[in-house]
Structures are given as structure tokens and as C-alpha cells.
Amino acid sequence: MSNVLLSKLSSELADLDGQVSQIDQQISQLRRKKAELIQKKQALERKIEMKTNEDSDVVLDRWDQDSFPWSDEANQILKNKFRLEKFRPLQSAAINAVMSKEDAIVILSTGGGKSLCYQLPALLAKGLTLVISPLVSLVEDQIMQLQKLGIDAASLNANTPKDEAKRVEQAITKGSTELRLLYVTPEKLAKSKRMMNQLEKSLGVGYLKLIAIDEVHCCSQWGHDFRTDYSFLNVLKRQFKGVPILGLTATATSNVLDDVKKMLGIPVAIVFRAGFNRANLNYKVLTKPGSEDECVEKIVRTIKRKFSGKTGIIYCLSRNDCEKLAKSLKANGIRAKHYHAYMEPVDRSAAHQKWVSGEIQVIVATVAFGMGIDKPDVRFVIHHSLPKSIENYYQESGRAGRDGLPATCILYYRMSDIFKQSSMIQQEQTGIANLYNMVRYASDTVTCRRVKLAEHFEEAWEPSWCQKQCDVCEKSSNSPGTATEDVSKEAVVVINIIEENLSSAKDGSGRITGNKLLDLLSKKLKGRRTKDFCEKLIVHLLLESYLQEDFHYTVYSVISYVVVGLKWRVYNRKDEIPMTLDNTKKGRAEENNRKRKAAVTSSDEEVDVGDDDDVITL
């Protein structure tokens, strides 16, 4: 090859290198521009949300008045029948809307008084209100409470005695009795043509006045608790024309609300939404100890020191966890009882009644212990394990402090719980996405807990409004601050561990679980990074899609493995991977970051990751 040709090729190569360098610079500029635009977009969304809230206030003012034809009677029924002095927020407005034949959706936090929004109109309208509720046990409890108030309410299910079923069916079709509320499950409506025919007759004689759908978020496939039998409810608006529909839930995002309206055929339903904030609740996220014995010891110490003699709930992931923890609490002198769906109904009821009466102090439960729990003086709710969604966490923690007095909500969090939970919910349509949102909440040690909840429920919120009623805001005044570090070098170590494990096993058995990955990474970075840092790094890479879970199904279980994620496959090795860390000495962290960028390494073992004491994680 001639020198002229070689020189020409070298020149072309240099030119291409220059073009590639320019493109890299343009990509970096575009990324920065994208970040700026995202910030502007989020700011506009917050303004729009605040404007929407203003519009909601206008709607509330229109309906929350005492000038309706039935207002005086409604107040009399409230005092004389329900023995209440005044309406809670949104109750009066919702009642006025459905009495005006308007479709409506009420979003009220757990314990906010949703039931009255259809129970009182049932007496006002002097006809039948059909209540669709998912749990038979909850239905039976409500009917018992209504009957104590002298209100005729009934249900139709597999356990209903024949004589009672006959009475109810005659009342539905003839409309000449005092039956005011009929409770059914969505399954009952979906599977019983006879039931639907009877309701049509009820409408024909002018007896059916209102349809109330409890836990209405279950209609939405994008909700945290979608139930297929709720899909049948899309026939109600067509089949029972002129009958208003009232949906009730404790939590619903805008997407879920839109989906519910579309599915039920009530696109212009009036939405009454209470603010998400419960000012009397103190939210805390604590690092879950590595061993179960240590975790039990910590919970026992917390209950004895801070909540001695006070009522509480502890939520666990599985029935086995419930039984073991309840046994451990009792062994430590705490009056506790387990509660889960696999218990006999009579045993569940007995545990519930003992807790309500104060005979036992703490109920240790799965999510089976939830809807319809009406005990105002719960002083603490502890989550022994990570909930499957923010909605679940908000509802479960919201069972504390219904009397308005101070209460504490404690969540114990550790990475290993992510994989336990994901293996249980991975087949739900939005299960993993909902779980990862919960992980973002739990793993964030910088952002006010109420800000995180507000973001999820699409409400405007300023950290200063929290009044130090969460662990983040409580420590912020004394906090040494945070530092954003580039963890791209450490990410390479993580990816190499995964790939080396796979390549070393010819039979494909080299897949690695999250817990095993943490052990190997901690050994690789021993003396340079703490185990807590390694845990936070894996979670960060998982949430940012540099890693992802891959599920393997066996006869007895579902196993979660961690594999290389989509984002890593398109990752430019020159780019940073920023991660925010609690930091005792921010300047030193930034200096270590600069050193890390400058380091030229040829193997994982040579990565300079700084000193252990630079970072306080989790």
C-alpha cells in the first residue's frame, strides 16, 4: 500500500473519528435538553393538577350545600338514624349528586366514611339501593351494623338462608317493603341471570334507585387490584337506564379513574376526591435487619417502648410469616394474634373481635385483614415486608389514627423482599410496575414521604407542609446532605458478575438470584463499598432498567432471577449512571467521583470505588 493511499485512509479515519466525536457531543447535548424539557413538562403538569384541584373545589361548592329539597330530611336521618352530628368531608356533596340522579365517583381515604354516601341516600330515596361489594365477610359486617341501627339491609349469596332469600327476592320484584340496601358480590351478578332479571323488574316498578360499587378501582385493568368479575359491571348503565351509579374507592390515579369511567359507561361522572394527606400520620421507612430474629427483636422493642398497651396492626407477606411473628410476639409478652385468609371463618372472626375489644393488642395479618376494619384508635401500623403497591401501602397504613390523633406508620424495607413480592405478583398485568413504584418510595431516603405519595396520586404538595411528620423531613434539618455519584464503574462489576455466572455454566444453570448477586458483589467490592451500598446499587440498576427480573416457573414455586436489562444493552459506556446517596462528607464524595472518572482500569478488581465511610446508604 502506497504512502499516499495510507495517508488518505488515515485522514478519512481521523475525519470519521471527528464526526463520531461530534455526534457524541450532540447526543450529550440532546440528553441535557431532554432532561430540561422533562423538568418543564413536570412543572406544567403540576400547574395543570393545581388548576384541576381548583376546578374540583368549584364542583364541590356546587354540591356541598343545604339548599336541596331533601337537605333537611338528610340531616334528620344523619342524626336520628346514624347517630352522627355532622357530615364528614365530601359526604354531603356525594349524597346530593346521586339524589340528583348524577353518576359520581367518591375517592375517600380509608376510614373517611364512604359507606354513608350510599347508605343515607338509600333511606332518602325510599327505594332499593344495590351495593356491589367484593367481600362476603365485609358485607355481613355492614348488614349487622345497619340492622343495629334499625335499617333493613340484606344480601344474596351462597350462605343466605332460603327463607331470607325468598323474602329478599319478593321485595326486589314487588317493591312494597322496607328493604333499603341489597348487598351482592360482582360474581353473583355475573353468574346469576335470575338476579339480573329480578333487578330489571325492580326497575320496572320504580323500586331500584341507586347502584353503588364499592372498591370501584377493581374495574380497571390498570388498578392495583383488578378483578375479572368487575368487568361484567359494564352492562349496568345500559341495562338499568336512569339509575345513577356511585363508585367508591380509597385510591385511584387519573389513569385508573378514566379507565373506570370508560368501563362503566359513565364518562361525565362527577368526581369527589379528598386530599391524600393524613396529617396525623407519621410515615417512617426503616432498614429491615438481615436476620428474622433481629427483625423480631426490633419490632418487640418498638412496641414495648413506644406503643405499650396501644393497639396496632402488623402486615406480613405470607400466612407463615404471620403465624411465626405472632408466636414470637406472644413469647415476648405482647398480646398478639395472627389473621389470614386460610384460617377458618369462625377463627378469623374471633381474632378480629378480640382485637376490636382490646383483648389482644396486636393483630399480625396478611392483606386479608383490610376492608371494613373500623377501629378508630389504632396507634401504629407496621409493615414487616414490602407491600405490592403504593395503593396497598396507603390503604393499609391508613388504618392507623382514624380518630384523628397521632399515629405512626412504619415500613421495614430490604432488597430481598422485592424478589419475594415480585414472584407472587408477576402475573398481574401491572404487578411489577406497581411494585417498583413502591420500591422507589421505600428506597428514596431524600424525598419527603408525602411528596412521593402526592406524586403518585397526582396531587400538588410542598415538603414544608409535611411539618416533619416523616423520617426524611424529620432528619433533613440535621442531615449532612446528599451527593449524586457516577456508579457506572460499579455497574460494570454487576453486569460482569451476571455474565460470568452464565458463561461458566454450560447447562444454563448459571442464572443468578438477587440475593446471590448481592453476596457476590459485596465480596468483589469488599473494603471499598459497604454491603448496604451494594444493595442500593442493585435496586437502582433494577429500577432504571439496567437490570431486570426473569421469572422461572417450577411445580411448587416461581423463582426470580436477575438478568441484564434492556437499558444496559443500548448503554453508551462513556455515559454516567448517576445515583443519589446520603453523604456524610459531600465534598469527599465529589472528589471520589472525579477520581473514579479518571481511573483507567483493566479489570473489576482495579475499580476505585472510594472509602466505605464516605457514604451512608439506606
Curated annotation (Swiss-Prot):
Ranges where the record places region Disordered: 586-618
Catalytic activity of the protein: Couples ATP hydrolysis with the unwinding of duplex DNA by translocating in the 3'-5' direction; ATP + H2O = ADP + phosphate + H(+)
Cofactor note: Binds 1 Zn(2+) per monomer.
UniProt keyword list: ATP-binding, DNA-binding, Helicase, Hydrolase, Isomerase, Metal-binding, Nucleotide-binding, Nucleus, Zinc
Highest taxon above the source species: Eukaryota
Binding site for Zn(2+): 448, 466, 470, 473
Cross-referenced InterPro entries: DEAD/DEAH_box_helicase_dom, DNA_helicase_ATP-dep_RecQ, Helicase_ATP-bd, Helicase_C-like, P-loop_NTPase, RecQ_Zn-bd, WH-like_DNA-bd_sf
Transmembrane segments: none
EC number(s) per entry: 5.6.2.4
Compartments, as annotated in UniProt: Nucleus
Chain positions of motif DEVH box: 214-217
UniProt GO MF annotations: 3'-5' DNA helicase activity; ATP binding; ATP hydrolysis activity; DNA binding; four-way junction helicase activity; metal ion binding
Residues annotated as domain Helicase ATP-binding: 95-270
UniProt keyword Manganese, yes or no: no
Domain Helicase C-terminal: 295-443
Chief location bin: nucleus
GO cellular component, as recorded: chromosome; cytoplasm; nucleus
Compositionally biased tracts (Acidic residues): 603-618
Gene3D superfamilies: P-loop containing nucleotide triphosphate hydrolases (3.40.50.300), Winged helix-like DNA-binding domain superfamily/Winged helix DNA-binding domain (1.10.10.10)
Required co-factors: Zn(2+)
Function: DNA helicase that may play a role in the repair of DNA that is damaged by ultraviolet light or other mutagens. Exhibits a magnesium-dependent ATP-dependent DNA-helicase activity that unwinds single- and double-stranded DNA in a 3'-5' direction.
The family this protein is said to belong to: Belongs to the helicase family. RecQ subfamily.
Protein name, entry field: Putative ATP-dependent DNA helicase Q1
